Amino acid sequence: MDADLNKLWEKTLNIVKSEMSEVSFNTWIKSCEPISISDTSIKISVPNSFTKDILDKRYKSLVANSIEAVCSKLYEIKFIIESDLNNEDELNNSDNSDKNRDKNSRRNIVVNDEMSSTLNPKYTFNSFVIGNSNRFAHAASLAVAEAPAKAYNPLFIYGGVGLGKTHLMHAIGHYILQNNTKAKVVYVSSEKFTNELINAIKDDKNEEFRKKYRNVDVLLIDDIQFIAGKERTQEEFFHTFNELHDANKQIILSSDRPPKEIPTLEDRLRSRFEWGLIADIQVPDFETRMAILKKKADVENLKVANEVMGYIATKIKSNIRELEGALIRIIAYSSLTNREVTVDLASEALKDIISKKQGKHVTIPSIQEIVANYFNLKIDDLKSQRRTRNVAYPRQIAMYLSRKLTDMSLPKIGEEFGGRDHTTVIHAYEKISENLKSDESLQHTVSDITKKVSQN
């Protein structure tokens, strides 16, 4: 960020901190970062919509008045959700026109001056929590960052919403720029790529558009699945991909599904997406969820007991955003009610979220039924002592999913599968986990069954 804006913010924080409790300051203000300043307003990045709502309702005037006390000028305060910075052109567009553009594009992030790349400073390899669910994707991303266009090109990362795909993409960009400040790195969402193409066609600036995206060393495109069905965008990206790949430039793509499952994607693009390495990120297991919560608490300087984090990790399983959001919600609830953070308080704070999730409770019998139907077996076959491959492998998949999708203990899972020992369950879980890293057919099978279980 601009040096003057940095000094202004530091002095502002000192005033704000004196007007708030330590818990409230750490919860709401500490994670905020000023993005830009114009003649009339200051834009401030906030981590999520919940924090933005609280700041708008309770602390906006305090921040504005504190800034006025520092610089003797009253600015309009605009809180902007961090994730929106990637989807909207907040960093490159001023409030008025080109006159203020330079002021409003300042931010404390590593970017190449020649490009309009936007990388989140918080998304680095150091801040990424590694677990069984993302270890392969992390290793692949680091390998690409260490040797762009020499390891895997393209790198295609896929997984559900909020599992860390964008984090890894930004981390790759940061790592490359830190080791080569002259590298031209561009990160963009597929939606923004499409919108810029539309504007380029409308304004007859096709060559400028092509120069921007083809004259780079590293191109990172998030949510590439959204170009499916857009013929002109696919045509343009096909040629962009070819030119970059032929020039030995690195391409990194992310999606919510593997290339072969993206509908209405042209075959020529699908095949190119599969040229390099495809790495998936799965829903984090309990141990990884705990590690994520501890990391978040450390970064935000939050004091939360292990039993409370254990409660959150048990109840919130879907994705990292919800997990971290639940922690912030609990801290906020504690701050607003002036109560200590306990499991009981956590239960109160998350009751609405938990009640919605419990409406879709997954059981081992439901998993067994769906797996049995999928493989044309009977549930009794999964519980039997038969060891033929046509029974044993589906049984291992069912055990794996029982471990992933339920709260049942290993002994309980073993009991549900014909009274098997918990070590058998561990073996099944580890075998399927390992095979998922390289077996695309198994990846499709597990994904398909998981969807059926969630819809059941």
Swiss-Prot record:
Region (Domain III, AAA+ region): 118-334
Stretch list, region Domain IV, binds dsDNA: 335-456
Positions contributing to ATP binding: 162, 164-166
Chain positions covered by the region annotation Domain II: 85-117
Chief location: cytoplasm
Start and end residues of each stretch annotated as Domain I, interacts with DnaA modulators: 1-85
MF (Gene Ontology): ATP binding; ATP hydrolysis activity; DNA replication origin binding; lipid binding
Signal peptide positions (record): none
Keywords from the UniProt entry: ATP-binding, Cytoplasm, DNA replication, DNA-binding, Lipid-binding, Nucleotide-binding
Compartments in which it is found: Cytoplasm
Biological process, per Gene Ontology: DNA replication initiation; regulation of DNA replication
The keyword Cell membrane appears for this protein: no
Residues in coiled coil: none
A GO CC annotation given for this chain: plasma membrane
InterPro entries: AAA+_ATPase (IPR003593), Chromosome_initiator_DnaA (IPR001957), Chromosome_initiator_DnaA-like (IPR020591), Chromosome_initiator_DnaA_CS (IPR018312), DnaA_C (IPR013159), DnaA_dom (IPR013317), DnaA_N_dom (IPR024633), DnaA_N_sf (IPR038454)
SUPFAM superfamilies, A to Z: P-loop containing nucleoside triphosphate hydrolases, TrpR-like
Record carries keyword Transcription regulation: no
A Pfam family per the record: Bac_DnaA
Superkingdom to which the source organism belongs: Bacteria
Family assignment from sequence similarity: Belongs to the DnaA family.
Comment field on protein domains: Domain I is involved in oligomerization and binding regulators, domain II is flexibile and of varying length in different bacteria, domain III forms the AAA+ region, while domain IV binds dsDNA.
Role, per record: Plays an essential role in the initiation and regulation of chromosomal replication. ATP-DnaA binds to the origin of replication (oriC) to initiate formation of the DNA replication initiation complex once per cell cycle. Binds the DnaA box (a 9 base pair repeat at the origin) and separates the double-stranded (ds)DNA. Forms a right-handed helical filament on oriC DNA; dsDNA binds to the exterior of the filament while single-stranded (ss)DNA is stabiized in the filament's interior.
Quaternary assembly: Oligomerizes as a right-handed, spiral filament on DNA at oriC.
Name this polypeptide is given: Chromosomal replication initiator protein DnaA
Lineage: Bacteria, Bacillati, Bacillota, Clostridia, Eubacteriales
Gene name tied to this protein: dnaA
